Amino acid sequence: MWRTEDGGTSWSAVRGSPGGDDYQRIWIHPTDPNLILAVSDQGAVVSSNRGESWSNWYTQPTAAVYHVTTDNAFPYRVCSGQQDSGSICVASRSDDGEITFHDWHPANIQEYGIAAPDPRDPEVVFGSARRGVSRYDRRTGQTAQVGPDSAARGEKFGRNVRTMPLIWSPVNPNVLYYTSNVVWKSVDRAHTWTRISPDLARQTWTVPASAGRYASSVTPAPRGAITALSPSPKSGAVLWAGTDDGNIQVTTDGGATWKNVTPAAIKPWTRIFNIEAGHFDARTAYAAANTLRIDDMHPHFWRTHDDGRTWTEINHGIADNAVANSIREDPRVPGLLYAATDAQVWVSLDDGANWQSLRLNMPAISVRDIQVKDDSTCVCADLVAGTHGRGFWILDGLTPIRQLARSRGRAGTYVVTPQTAVRVRFGTNEPTPWPPELPAAQNPAAGAIIDYALAANAAGSVKLEIVDASGRLIRSYSSDDPVLDPDPALDPASYDRVCQKNPGAADCGLPLYWPAPQQRLATHAGLHRFRWDTRYQPIGDNPRTGEVEATGAVPHRSERTPVTPWAAPGRYTVRLTVEGKSYTQPLTLRLDPRVKTPPAGLRQLAALSREMYDLAAASHAAYLQARARVDSLSGAARAQVESLAPAAPARAPRALARPGQPAPATPPTLESASRAALAAAMAMQDADVAPTAAQVAACTRARAQVNAVLARWRRLEPPPRRSRRR
């Protein structure tokens, strides 16, 4: 960016990087020249002092990416080059409760390049570029050039354009493909390359009608290059290729021979943005044909089930005036397709015969690429989108869409089979958290995601239960569970008035931009999502125990301090009860894959946590029994019971323990013993590691205390009345 103050006689550079920031527009306030707004490929910046200093464009999610890929780390990273801002590899989940600058790092890919993370080593990221292929290693921070000999242009290397495909074989993790106008293959992780195709672009081309009056001045340019490549997940011998001049070619023998299978309706100058080889048979493929360059703004998606011999255009339901960019097939459900245009994302449940919007809360933006992330490394089922101007977006949990596709949209009340849940901590950062004015992206929800559908409005309450493999109830939710009204997260202004009248009410001691919206089971017709936090049932009458958690606090998403231990990894059953009828589905809970604690230590942790929880629950149940009977007693008997179960303070029942809370002083009571056991359990919940000697000792003390007070209670407890025999 340049500035002149003498009518253009002299100029001074005032802003920009050595590589150029690509400024597009500048606006100067007509009456206050100190105020300047500028926009570039990176975002918008503001100066209030004639350009001496500027605001930060990193306050805006304006990344313009060309493609999107994911790696096999846990949590997985989302990677791409981006327009004039360096490449990106950003975690899809953060241990800090929200995704911040701590969670991303460049991978040294050119701005328009395609990232190809090593499937066997997520610390290594390969990237495509005009000059070839790069290899970035996070451990060393170094980048090597490892592509075919790009110095030898012409016939040997071939032609290329800005976004050259670079993709790993889905059937052989050692095989990597790269393209120019020919396909290159490496079987040794980019150490050596072999050319496996002829020139796959059109041999001739004509001037498109859209050139109009300029047609006579158009001069021949170099022929096209390959812009789409898709190896088959079913056969290592099948590859599909598409070019930026409208060719689609396929090989079924590993590149020995290629066949041009371009649909007749695809015109020259059409850019094949992507091809998706079928996941369920090697003869199927889908293609996104982008016709922007010939002034055709209609979407054009194609499908073949016979090796490309015949093609069907599949656009019904997709809005016009937005060209096709990407199409993907769900790897789990045949016929379930996702598509991206220059405006939004779409979904088809019937192999492209009909489409419906999947935009949801996304802005209207050019979605350049989409990927289905679903494998054993991520323990997920997500749809990842790369946009040209709004960065990355992730749709968490495709299971409801998959169920709709399998059932072809059947109606009724049901529970969607949950995807495997991973026991991760939402946020582990110690206070103070990042303030809300700093840019951050949302973490996915922690816990088990449970989707359910109601065919009609429920006549009564809706109940959701989690049952373990032995049939024991672990957690129970009801649509009648008490919640704060109004919700401080959703209506802070109204709740602030509550706080003015009652400063001691929940959440009134902190700004109301911290709490997360409350969960409540929905009772109206439709598809609903609920989350089990993968913990045991709170002990006490009020499920809203615990204040907003300081550790892991996130603006607008801060959870409450947990008051019960984690449920152990294993198999569970989700049971939904509506109007007396129950619907069940199995649920698997897994440990965080990053945990490497030996099994013996994990078993000890689970056993002690469960034992302490059970002791706390038993002691609290005895306390409730004692308080229920104390009014029927008098004299010494009443005094003895009250010594074990004194009346609770006015605000009880509350949370029985907080992590690290010490056991109360003697004399022990049923409630103090319950708190001691729960405190011993909660002290072990911060990490999936074997309990320390101090933690084991605390469990020993709590066990003895609970057993002692329960024994005293049993001696005092009146025997149950028996009916007299008549």
Locations of the language-model features?
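Short acidic/polar inter-strand loop motif in beta-rich domains
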Residues: 538-542, 577-585
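Mature extracytoplasmic or organellar-lumen-exposed domains after removal of signal/transit peptides
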Residues: 587, 620-726
